[in-house]
Structure formats: structure tokens, C-alpha cells
């Protein structure tokens, strides 16, 4: 089982990703977080294998949150904005 955390400040977007992930039984969503504080707490608590991380959130970007992690797990960036897609590959 792959422990997965969803971090997105838009609850509907978080729900949509969770719905898509239901087609992948090997992924277990252990937490849905809607801000950086919930996200950091969930990461420390669950030690996930994978994080779906929104690029643009209030007060902090997904890129900035990633920099706060000492030993980050695999990250899949999510965004509704084309301009962030290229930066996510860097």
C-alpha cells in the first residue's frame, strides 16, 4: 500500500483528486489537507510515500512547502495554471 497525502487549499480540488485515486487501490489516501500547517502535520504524522501537492496555495506555494521538507517523499504537483507546469518539472 502506498500512503498518500493530498495538499490543496481548494477542498473541491482535493476531493476531485481523491475521487480519481479511487481507481488505484494500491494508493491509500491517509490525509487530505487544505493548508501548509495541516500538510506539515500530516507529513510528520503519516510519513507518506507520495504527496499530491498544489502548486499555488494561500501564503505559500507548493514549491516553498517542498523546500521545508528535509527528506521529501515522491511529489506530484497539481495545478490549474499552465505557467506553473514547467517550473514543476525543474
Where are these regions (language model features)?
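Charged phosphotransfer/docking patches of two-component systems
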Residues: 14-15, 85
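Alpha-helical interaction/dimerization surfaces of two-component signaling modules
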Residues: 19-24, 42
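Conserved Asp/Asn-Gly motif in the active-site loop of CheY-like receiver
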Residues: 30-39
Amino acid at each position: 500500500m502506498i500512503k498518500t497525502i493530498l495538499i490543496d487549499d481548494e477542498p473541491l480540488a482535493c476531493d476531485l483528486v481523491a475521487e480519481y485515486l479511487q481507481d488505484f487501490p494500491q494508493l491509500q489516501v491517509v490525509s487530505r489537507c487544505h493548508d501548509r500547517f495541516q500538510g506539515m502535520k500530516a507529513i510528520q504524522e503519516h510519513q507518506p510515500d507520495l504527496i499530491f501537492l498544489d502548486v499555488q496555495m494561500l501564503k505559500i506555494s507548493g514549491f516553498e512547502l517542498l523546500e521545508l521538507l528535509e527528506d521529501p517523499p515522491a511529489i506530484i504537483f497539481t495545478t490549474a495554471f499552465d505557467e506553473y507546469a514547467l517550473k514543476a518539472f525543474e
